[in-house]
């Protein structure tokens, strides 16, 4: 047994090496702003460190940052305090980002053990999780998903221990950890409902109060502060930057959440599948349905274990969290499901064990047809394992290196544009760009994103999207912006591709090319006459 545990531990340690290697390669954060949110977190951290309040320094008017809670920015602000020079301080930020991956792995091992896995199995499952390219990518990004997943895991472990020992002190600690998770990412709010339900069903209502008190305090404090400081605006761009709820309610039609759920559900299942077996290439014959089948497989395992054991706090939270991302106005891609990935991984391994036990039983049967079926299922399982392993190899040898090589080239082009801006533009000139955080950090110019169309994606209102971009000079004038920075990723945006012809658009009379680089173009926009 010790030999198996040692082998599993070695596998887990080796599974962390690709993430460490990528963190070293990407330590200068050429990909800063890849998710947009990461740039906003980094700028909010700068604001905290400089003592200017919790603000969006890059946005014209510098409104308060009332969209993202301050958990991660507070942590990153320590980097700005110790090393305030940008971009020289970015490698220090990578230390914080990279530390989240082993922390997530350790907490996930403890979680799976607490749910019934052996330590050996838990380490193997978590090693597979941290090898996933989506997890590795977030392990080298200034995003809160791994941090909130770690805090949630600690919260769940403490809550389970509080019930086992009937301890109010541990229940309080669990609530504090839940509050920290909420202050890192507000999507942790389902804990506020899941916790009391679970404690009550376990006949520990007294502990529920100790759990809820610090969690509720975190929700009340952040909600009160953000409500009082939200910029009073009906402008869609400002609302996007400053309010999740405001952005959701803006132009929301009656019962439109039903459309969100209908279109988000297949993405939800695919994202679960991709976090377990990455989709570097479509499976022959099955194609896009393979990740969904993997997602359903994991959910089946969760349900099976629930029926055999009982409904835990992790199930109540995952149910509430899943409902939240399904009704949201953005497709629930892999990023959104990282906080509940350990549960899906647990469900997948439970179902694999169940299937393997069934195959072994059938193989020992005297009936030839049962042995034939067992052989078929064994072959399918072996093929899936081989396919999954090959996808990891492709991800680490081809996909991830390609992504970061591309962003190295993009930043090189952008920095030449930034040098031109610093030499030729007045300091306060706002710039329209999807690289708003990066543009502000390298030039000091206020910057803002181009129009955002979450609801049009669900409505398939491509005409409105095309018209809005055709009228971009009007949009720019309304924001007092005269300049536009376009990058390579803008042209390849999967939502806009086929709708917006950037080459045709920027060849119009309102656009004057000022700087052209291999992967970036900088324009002056004249308002229409």
Residue ranges: model-predicted function:
Residues 138-139, 145-148, 181-186, 190-193, ...:
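Hydrophobic/aromatic-rich transmembrane helices and adjacent perimembrane loops
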Residues 92-116, 154, 158, 296-303:
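Transmembrane-helix motifs of polytopic, lipid-linked glycan transferases
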Residues 8-13, 176, 192, 212-220, ...:
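Signature aromatic-anchored transmembrane alpha helix within multi-pass, membrane-resident enzymes
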Residues 92-100, 124-154, 159, 168, ...:
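Multi-pass, polyprenyl lipid-linked donor-dependent membrane glycosyltransferases
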Residues 374-436, 469-478, 482, 526:
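Membrane-embedded, lumen/periplasm-facing catalytic core of multi-pass transferases
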Residues 70-74, 82-103, 138, 142, ...:
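Loop-to-helix entry region of an early transmembrane alpha helix in multi-pass inner-membrane enzymes
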Residues 114-116, 155-173, 181, 306-309:
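Membrane-interface transmembrane helices that cradle and orient dolichyl/undecaprenyl
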Residues 21, 25, 205-300, 383-395:
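Membrane-lumen/periplasm interface segments of specific transmembrane helices
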């Amino acid at each position: 047994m010790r030999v198996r545990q040692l082998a599993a531990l070695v596998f887990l340690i080796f599974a962390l090496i690709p993430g460490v290697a990528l963190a070293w390669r990407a330590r200068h954060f050429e990909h800063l702003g890849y998710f947009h949110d990461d740039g906003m977190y980094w700028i909010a951290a700068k604001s905290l460190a400089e003592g200017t309040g919790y603000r969006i320094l890059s946005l014209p008017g510098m409104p308060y940052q009332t969209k993202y809670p301050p958990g991660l920015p507070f942590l990153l602000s320590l980097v700005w305090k110790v090393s305030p020079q940008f971009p020289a301080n970015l490698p220090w930020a990578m230390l914080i980002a990279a530390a989240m991956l082993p922390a997530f792995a350790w907490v996930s091992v403890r979680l799976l053990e607490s749910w019934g896995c052996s330590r050996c199995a838990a380490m193997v499952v978590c090693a597979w999780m941290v090898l996933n390219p989506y997890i590795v990518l977030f392990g080298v990004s200034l995003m809160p998903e791994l941090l909130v997943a770690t805090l949630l895991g600690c919260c769940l472990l403490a809550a389970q221990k509080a019930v086992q020992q009937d301890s109010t002190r541990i229940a309080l600690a669990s609530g504090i950890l839940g509050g920290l998770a909420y202050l890192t990412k507000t999507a942790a709010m389902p804990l506020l409902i899941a916790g009391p339900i679970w404690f009550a069903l376990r006949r520990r209502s007294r502990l529920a109060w100790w759990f809820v008190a610090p969690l509720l305090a975190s929700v009340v404090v952040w909600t009160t502060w953000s409500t009082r400081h939200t910029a009073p605006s009906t402008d869609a761009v400002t609302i996007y930057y400053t309010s999740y709820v405001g952005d959701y309610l803006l132009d929301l039609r009656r019962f439109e959440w039903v459309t969100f759920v209908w279109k988000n559900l297949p993405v939800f299942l695919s994202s679960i599948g991709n976090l377990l077996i990455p989709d570097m290439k479509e499976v022959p014959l099955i194609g896009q349905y393979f990740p969904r089948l993997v997602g359903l497989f994991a959910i089946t395992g969760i349900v099976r274990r629930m029926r055999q054991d009982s409904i835990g706090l992790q199930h109540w939270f995952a149910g509430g969290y899943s409902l939240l991302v399904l009704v949201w106005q953005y497709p629930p891609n892999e990023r959104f499901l990282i906080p509940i990935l350990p549960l899906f991984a647990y469900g997948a391994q439970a179902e694999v064990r169940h299937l393997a036990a069934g195959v072994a039983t059938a193989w020992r049967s005297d009936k030839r047809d049962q042995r034939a079926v067992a052989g078929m299922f064994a072959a399918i399982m072996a093929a899936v394992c081989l396919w999954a392993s090959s996808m990891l190899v492709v991800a680490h040898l081809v996909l991830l290196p390609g992504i970061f090589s591309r962003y190295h080239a993009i930043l090189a082009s952008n920095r030449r544009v930034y040098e031109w801006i610093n030499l030729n533009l007045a300091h306060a000139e706002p710039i329209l760009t999807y690289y708003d955080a990066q543009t502000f950090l390298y030039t000091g110019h206020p910057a803002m994103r181009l129009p955002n169309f979450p609801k049009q994606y669900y409505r398939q209102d491509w005409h409105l999207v095309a018209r809005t971009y055709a009228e971009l000079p009007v949009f720019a004038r309304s924001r007092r912006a005269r300049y536009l920075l376009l990058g390579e990723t803008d042209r390849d945006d999967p939502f806009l591709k086929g709708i917006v012809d950037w080459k045709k658009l920027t060849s119009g009379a309102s656009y004057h090319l000022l700087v052209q680089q291999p992967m970036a173009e900088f324009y002056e926009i004249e308002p229409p006459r």
